[in-house]
């Protein structure tokens, strides 16, 4: 049996995880625990200092934004980024790892129900403008989340691959990465 590799879009506003369909070899997004294809890239710390990740975190953020972390990808290589919520020291790697873990935990629940193996090997997308430092920190976040990060892929390249170039042989096409940073 071939090794299963999963694709993760660790987005600024929303994130998702996908697998390749065994039927038609096309990517399929694995729904999260709320049966949605994307998970908000938000972490909220409750009254006890415990992190909540995803949709619930985004809803809680509306009530108390001071205990929430969003848009963390923008801070990935900012050495002066310092944030403490309660007694918890926040770092971009730590928050990104929590988001990745939420995606994988939800995917594993869905896969376990279907008798499939757990998510372990992944490729994570990163903005094309990310330098070596941001890429290394993103890889570290994946490792902190317990993943084997096989590669980091530029987001526009991932979009082109996801769109599927096989049916466009001999034709020109363009991928424009508008991003989602303003869609929160």
Where do the model's predicted regions map?
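N-terminal phosphate-binding loop and flanking beta/alpha elements of the actin-like ATPase fold
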Residues: 1-40, 45-176, 180
């Amino acid at each position: 049996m071939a090794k299963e590799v999963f694709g993760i879009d660790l987005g600024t506003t929303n994130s998702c995880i996908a697998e390749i369909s065994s039927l038609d070899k096309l990517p399929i997004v694995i729904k999260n625990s709320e049966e949605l294809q994307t998970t908000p890239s938000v972490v909220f710390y409750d009254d006890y200092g415990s992190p909540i990740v995803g949709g619930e975190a985004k809803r809680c953020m509306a009530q108390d934004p001071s205990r929430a972390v969003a848009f963390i990808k923008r801070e990935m290589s900012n050495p002066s980024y310092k944030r403490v919520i309660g007694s918890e020291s926040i770092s971009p790697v730590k928050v990104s790892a929590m988001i990745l873990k939420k995606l994988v935990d939800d995917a594993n629940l869905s896969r376990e129900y279907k008798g499939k193996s757990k998510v372990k090997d992944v490729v994570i997308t990163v903005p094309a403008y990310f330098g070596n430092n941001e890429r290394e920190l993103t890889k570290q976040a994946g490792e902190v989340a317990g993943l084997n990060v096989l590669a980091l892929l530029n987001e526009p390249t991932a979009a082109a691959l996801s769109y599927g170039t096989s049916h466009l042989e001999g034709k020109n096409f363009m991928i424009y990465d508008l991003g989602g940073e303003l869609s929160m």
